[in-house]
A protein has these predicted regions:
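Catalytic core of non-heme Fe(II) oxygenases with the double-stranded beta-helix
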Residues: 79-195
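Non-heme Fe(II)/2-oxoglutarate
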Residues: 1-83, 97-100
Length: 196
């Protein structure tokens, strides 16, 4: 079992385990934050009120290609960004009215994940925790990344991670799953329990 992390990791520590932060503040995220916070009628019928809700960004023409272009230097150590195709794009919205704001340990159904923080206001908690190195079994160092509005976290989909509980505030994000064109298995996912 990995040791508990107590503080947010700096960008150098995150980069050492294969997680890169990219500044995307030049893009206008306000409309996308609003879209993330509005529950579609279909999802309203399916979602549990106590859970973070997700909206499908593929239907809303989210600028995924532009995000990938701006994150290309962060993606390049993993693969040539031109080899990637968008597998899925969705938003998540967390607020203190929800009863469960965690996302248990998991590996994403992607080769590369780009997680864009659309909005973060007065947030306590709600960090993304990474377990070990991206190519490991989840043991070893455990690092926590703060989600900063207008910034993206870029990581390998295989990197074991989870979202810690939101104690207070509001956070919305866009999650982009990218797979390699023509490669089978990039979309395999693993879901485990929450690690205290």
């Amino acid at each position: 079992m990995a040791a508990l992390c107590l503080a947010d990791a700096d960008d150098a520590a995150l980069e050492a385990i294969g997680v890169r932060r990219v500044d995307l503040r030049e893009m206008d995220w306000a409309p996308w934050a609003a879209a993330a916070e509005t529950v579609s009628p279909l999802l309203a019928a399916q979602d549990d009120d106590g859970q973070p809700h997700a909206n499908d960004l593929l239907e809303l023409n989210y600028p995924a290609g532009e995000v990938l272009k701006r994150c290309s230097e962060a993606v390049a150590p993993f693969c040539d960004p031109s080899q990637l195709e968008l597998y899925d794009a969705f938003s998540l919205h967390y607020d203190s009215r929800q009863t469960d704001t965690t996302f248990n340990q998991h590996r994403d159904p992607s080769f590369v994940t780009i997680n864009v923080c659309l909005r973060s206001e007065n947030v306590v908690g709600s960090r993304v925790e990474f377990f070990g190195a991206w190519d490991g079994d989840g043991s070893g160092q455990r690092l926590r990344a703060e989600q900063q509005a207008g910034f993206a976290l870029v990581h390998r989909g295989r990197h074991l991670h989870q979202t810690t509980p939101l104690v207070k505030g509001i956070r919305s994000q866009a999650v982009l799953y990218w797979t390699r064109r023509g490669v089978v298995g990039d979309d395999d996912a693993t879901y485990l329990g929450f690690a205290e």
